[in-house]
Amino acid sequence: MNTLQTTRRAVVLLLTLLGIHASGLAQQARVSLLSELHKLSDLSRLPEYASGTVVRQTSSYDTTGNNDDGFSGKYSFVRRNPDSSLVIFEAPGNGVVNRIWTPTPNDELLDFYFGGSGKPAFSVKFSDLFSNKLFPFINPLCGNQLGGYYCYLPIPFKNGLRIVSRAKKMEFYQIQYRSFPKQTKVDNFSMQLKPEEQAAIKTLQGSWDLLRQHGNRPDANTKHLHMDTLLQPGQQVTLAEINSPGRINRMVLSPASAFSGNPKQLNIRITWDDEQIPAVYAPVADFFGYAFGSPSMQSLMLGAENDSLYLNFPMPFDRKAKIELIYRNAPNGHLPAQKIQMQLSYSATRRNPEREGKFYSYWNRAISTTPGKPHVFAAGKAKGHYVGTILQAQGLEPGMTLFFEGDDETHVDGQMTMHGTGSEDYFNGGWYAMLDRWDTKMSLPLHGALDYSLPFSRTGGYRLFLSDKLPFENSFFHAIEHGPENNNKRADYSSLAFYYADKPLSPGKAPDNAATTIYTPDTLMLYPQLMKYSVMGNIAIDGNTFTASGDGHLRISLQEIPPGNYQLYADLESNMEGAEVSLWQRQSLLKDQISFYWPKKEIKDRVFLVPLEVTGFKNTITFQFKPDPNRRKIWINRLIFVKR
């Protein structure tokens, strides 16, 4: 028996022994650590409504609308106690904390008070919620990557929960929780875990690996479909049509490379029960988490891996399901035929309309965001719950990705329930444009970064809401700002929202050529903090300051700059220690003398250096220092490449 089969049997056996299969769990009213862990391991229950519950969030966001979302600590607590400790979370009634996030953990203790008690039930260092040093706060539920520190370990509470930090100052944080009706029976979280709770945590990674690779566990009614098709431009093809009640458990499309590139010409359309509004209508690339035309996302529920696309969201329907691919003609030029394969698993298990919603998505491309208004992920009237977001974000103003300062905001049934502290924060990250923080693409089971490029001023992220799915009874609004204040940074946003509901929240727009073309800026910028360097000789690097001893060489990689012809500019500084340098491309001299000397300190923006050609072979520039013991420094704030 291989490792995969052994893991699958262990997970199934554990759930069987615990007696918490989906059919039984739906009938039990008690909320416990075990029941919440089961929501994270058995995702076949994701379509089930969470009626009567509300998900809210306490965060350090600036309530004045400005951008002090944790820097000063002014908004980073509910109240200060007489001993200067900080109440950072307080909720009445019954509930469960589903998510704790911060980019600024500290080593001070957090005290957890249950049910109005004057004595903490347990205390833990804030940093140990994420360090993987303290069980049960371990991977995959708790950890840190991409600049963010996250914990999804459920913390159920009855008759209220208060969390107090012994730190004198807190900075950025978010604590998300679900409140239950008063009559709900809840077992308080305890650090003394029962054997079955320990087992559930330890086997969770295995169950997630199985789900991502193989989809939800098949039942006796599972059937399989396979389709091969050669799709010509201008054609559409029905990949699957099921004319009886059931639910789709997994879909795989291949090759993933067929959906790459610019523009994104292939759309996917999924329709339930002949509804007028498609449940899914989006570019295939956007739906599966590509980043600006290239495969990127490998989440638990959908993504691209091994040149295949996978979709694991359970998708129940009442009478009929239809899945189509549409290959749009290009406005100019020839497109090749695409050979596509599809594998689908589904069962005849009927949807219970009283207890389950249908799966829907909403694709929203804003080629230019509206000043003063946020970008909407999803909005409308229905009953259901929100389960995921994908966002590609492209700045329209060259330079730093300041549009990603925008906060998320959620309104449920007419009331604001959540307000975030920044865009990478929403995706469980932190500190964009910082080395080894939010600076590259990375996929984790529940969240990740699709891309990060300072030269292109673009990024993107995704986040799944599983045990913390956001329920709504009548209406839902979920959006994100673009810019630190008043949505004041122009950007190009493309998003996918995923939710279950009794009907679509709102109709989307059909993806056409104009809305699926990827924006490519004509001005690109390199910043020192993420430049890639090579040096020859003795050169010290400190931020934007480069100091040479003798005739040092500083070579800067241009691999992030696309091939083409550019005018090269620089934002630089000069002063009395400024060196004289020459500029080279490989062995070709581009400019014999560039001076960083000036009698007093002066900042100079957009200084023209040289015309420059970048190719696959010529993708570096080198500054060669001219020896001078008194003038050994250059200061580069950024390099600017303007297409000719």
Q: Locations of the language-model features?
A:
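Bacterial Sec-dependent N-terminal signal peptides
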Residues: 1-28
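A generic structural signal for short, solvent-exposed coil/turn residues
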Residues: 18, 23, 92, 104, ...
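Short acidic/polar micro-motifs centered on Gly/Asp/Asn
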Residues: 4, 271-273, 627
